[in-house]
Amino acid sequence: MAEYKDTLNLPNTSFPMKASLSVREPEMLADWQAKGIYQKIRKARVGSKRFILHDGPPYANGHLHCGHALNKILKDIIIKSKTFSGFDAPFVPGWDCHGLPIELNVEKKVGKAGSKISPREFRAKCREYAASQIDIQRDEFQRLGVLGDWYNPYVTMDYHYEANIVRALGLMIKNGHLQQGFKPVHWCIDCGSALAEAEVDYEDKTSPSIDVAFSAVNPSEFLNCFETQPAVKPLILPIWTTTPWTLPANEAVCLHPEIDYALIDAGNSYYIVATDLVESVMARYGISHYKTSGSAKGRVFEHFKLQHPFYKRQVPVVLAEHVTTESGTGCVHTAPAHGPDDYLVGQSYQLPLINPVMANGCFAENVELFAGISVLKANETILAVLSERNVLLASESIRHSYPHCWRHKSPMIFLATPQWFISMDKSNLRQAIINEIDKVNWVPDWGKARISNMVENRPDWCISRQRSWGTPMPLFVHKTTRELHPDTLELIERVAVMIEKSGIDAWFDLDSSELLGDDAKHYDKITDTMDVWLDSGISHYSVLKHNNDLDFPADVYFEGSDQHRGWFNSSLTTAVAMYGVAPYKTVLTHGYTVDAEGKKLSKSKGNYVALDKLVNQHGADILRLWVASTDYRHEVSISEEIIKRNADAYRRIRNTARFLLANLFDFNPASDCIEAKELLELDRWALKRCQLLQEEIITAYENYHFHLIYQKIHNFCAVDMGSFYLDLIKDRQYTTAKDSIARRSCQTAMYHMVKAFTIWLAPILSFTAEEIWQTIPGNNSESIFIEHWYDAWPIIDAVNMEDWEQLHIVRDEVNKALEETRQRGEIGSALAAEVTVYADAKALPKLTRLGEELRFLFITSEAKACPISQSPKGLAVTDCGVSIQVTASAHEKCARCWHRREDVGQNQEHPELCLRCVGNISGYHEERLYI
């Protein structure tokens, strides 16, 4: 064989089998940056239709995790696929830079603002810290192969962006959406600030569950509402609560106007309880002997007076729709300072809005019985007071979902404080937002219901914060009337110009007289900062409307499912409040990253997968393949085992590319491509299969179904290529003459296929696709990412794809029969066999048409097809209607092609070869038509 090896066209390529991604990827990334590939992509698409995917800004704090990678890689896949589709698809990344997490990190180093360091110096340190985090995250995002305008990002702490936040506030004021109020808001005691809905996490917490007696001041007026005219004795409306610390702020007991309430005679006293809850309430109180003495609707008790359980004041019975009979008593403790429903009821009944709790979470000094006690520790004291006064009817502990600060993970409270709000209803904003939601394409479609529900039920948006590091609310309010200055809109623009020049310190350093002159003595300067969700939420204004390379509205916003209450919501609210339209056409949502069992990733649980470790060990392309392989619309599982499975799939893809490249080692597309009419039928089939598959892949990219692309490409490599086409062409590629039509035919097909295949891969396996691209013969563009979807296909005459599908099926059955024969020890390789296929009338013509080339379909030394009627008795018929007979060949093995042929040894000059091989090495070009 040694003397004939040099006569074979054996594959040869510089494209390595071992990927070594952790080494090659950084080198390629450096090359992209040195060549300015992103800028060249933009230049290549100048004048094309734009596609804008607007990046939701990650928070500039800490290293990236797998959730960041999932999000940015998905976006990158979209941007690159749209670029291949001919769009001008710029990607401008962003960062969210103000807010508490950065403050906390800076506090650890320099102390709190105003104590060890001045607020101005503190803000400078925050800015410095955020900038350092952006540098870290920028490098980590780029390492993932994400292309974008990384050195011209939008950054919410940039002076021009801060100025635009202020201008956005001005627009919302102009449109009548801002109002100030003393309202209950989510308050984090550790933060010392109000928080938005998006900054609240719900976690399980153990709380006291108590029932408290509110006694009727005048039992008769209650009893007179019942037709039974019961005898007069003490009467109690019991309330149930899990927040005893709010009882000092109680101003009413709330009933539902249309719920039926039962009058329960328990002997010494009456109870009024929702009829549906009587049994559970009496059981809780340990009262077994009682009777129902009447029933009445809740509305009949309106305005009747009750005695506060431990203060001298009397409180009214009020009515509201939020009362239910799901739990409790049907009588709801109402503290307007400590809950949004309570507040609304208080407003409608003009109840006192008295807040006994200070910003530090302690009761004020004038609060009787509980002065100075932290509300988080007050429950025990309050229960003791209730017991002393014999008004504690029941007490136990309950495990329930409770709001916690997203940053501190500590329980939050509702606290009435002076704040600024975007009113959801004042200028019909809520309905306008709901109308816009209907115009947006939500993917998955459940996103529409989710955000609609949030908008319908959300309270007014508290946008003010009592923090140092944030964009200021540049407002002046009258010292007496508390009204905004009449020139507020003009003043806001003047401040915006100042901030654009000097940053937010321009406001904090400002002396009011500089803007107001003599008016300054009548106005207070507001020192609150704005909610960071407003910062990122107005990116549609500061970025999409102010960057000439972008458009408004964006084609796509794409973030995790938590952003329905976060960035999707704040962006929608601000855009509608500012100019009446949604900022996006389509909203895509992906799930959270979880472990293989669907559990949240956590360092403490030991299931955390470190992103940097994955990238350094496996390479970014393996991570990108993991992203593409999952249906991101659900939770996305990741683990070392899952990544290893993706690495295995990657190797199959890489090996397919390597095989194609290795067989093009002597191919010059400019001179060696043959005309379409000369292509062998198998090669025409392969090219047609690729064209059809490309259409499916492009459609999947357009529909953002990346997991389908992964499946299609993997199947293409494993089935269409690995077990069929590439297997069949080896004999022709290796043994026929170098410049023969037969060989150049499959090389022509492989050339077109590898170019198309590489572009299919590029949005997902970006580094590997570029590596393949640089190895493909011919004059190729500087980078694959400047290309379009492949369209230089040969014009192919009709190929009967169904016939080839049938041939593929029969081949699979023959392979099974060969394997069974091999297992019995009758043959070694398939080339040691001769096969007879007995086929039905449908399959037979497809097989006999191939003639002598049928053996190349099965890769056996001999093959023939006969009518199934000639099948030997006892030979099984397969599901595809054929019977297969395998026998060991009795002929000698050709030393060059390894086929066992009758004519081996008939040529005296080459006695070890079959006559086909003799011809191929002697200048005779073997003719093939099909395979």
Curated annotation (Swiss-Prot):
GO cellular component terms listed in the entry, alphabetical order: cytosol
Coiled coil: none
Subcellular location, record wording: Cytoplasm
Complex and partners: Monomer.
Binding positions (Zn(2+)): 894, 897, 914, 917
Main location class: cytoplasm
Protein name as catalogued: Isoleucine--tRNA ligase
Family label: Belongs to the class-I aminoacyl-tRNA synthetase family. IleS type 1 subfamily.
Described purpose of this protein according to its UniProt entry: Catalyzes the attachment of isoleucine to tRNA(Ile). As IleRS can inadvertently accommodate and process structurally similar amino acids such as valine, to avoid such errors it has two additional distinct tRNA(Ile)-dependent editing activities. One activity is designated as 'pretransfer' editing and involves the hydrolysis of activated Val-AMP. The other activity is designated 'posttransfer' editing and involves deacylation of mischarged Val-tRNA(Ile).
Details of cofactor binding: Binds 1 zinc ion per subunit.
Gene name as annotated: ileS
Gene Ontology molecular function terms on file: aminoacyl-tRNA deacylase activity; ATP binding; isoleucine-tRNA ligase activity; tRNA binding; zinc ion binding
Keyword set includes rRNA-binding: no
